[in-house]
Amino acid sequence: VTQLYGDRMMIANATGCSSIWGASAPSIPYTCNHEGKGPSWANSLFEDNAEYGFGMYTAVKQIRNKIVDAMTELVSMDICEDAKAVFTEWLDSRNDGEASKVASAKVVELLEKPACDCTDEKAKELVKAIKDRKDYLVKRSQWILGGDGWAYDIGYGGLDHVLASGEDVNVLVFDTEVYSNT
């Protein structure tokens, strides 16, 4: 899974067996690519991992919504057409993992150079708001991992809530058939 989504993957892992075989020093399977980017991994209490992972997802979603608001306002302002095109491309592709990576690189490049010397104070404020959140431009792939004991018993209520939300999260249950918690 990390080979498919690694550089934009966020993992919430239920405490237990998978924490041991999936994140014990000195041999941790989560690595970085040539850009120094890789999955983020954190674990929570055994019983609340679904809620924990959902909270991670919701926090990122809120931050990205602030980026959307800033870019939407900038596009409606009197700024250079190049900037409008870059922001519009990101707005159109922000919910597609791979396309958002391409568009995000263009946004970061634009933000790093004084291409469109903004003199408008509101525009400067909005550009700063985007710069401050640039690590959230690429769409994250949120994963919630846990074992059969977690998913079918103590964590079921939270997991049911998360799945019923219809939000874009992924759940991987390690069904060992020996009720191995996580």
Stretches found by the model and what they are:
Residues 15, 19-46:
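Terminal amphipathic helices with adjacent charged low-complexity linkers/tails
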Residues 18-22, 31, 123, 130-182:
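Thiamine diphosphate
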Residues 45-122:
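N-terminal leader/propeptide and maturation segments of large enzyme subunits in energy/redox metabolism
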Residues 4-8:
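Long, compositionally biased charged/polar accessory segments in the mid-to-C-terminal portions
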Residues 10-20, 26, 62, 69-70, ...:
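Carboxylate/His-rich catalytic cores and anion/metal-binding grooves
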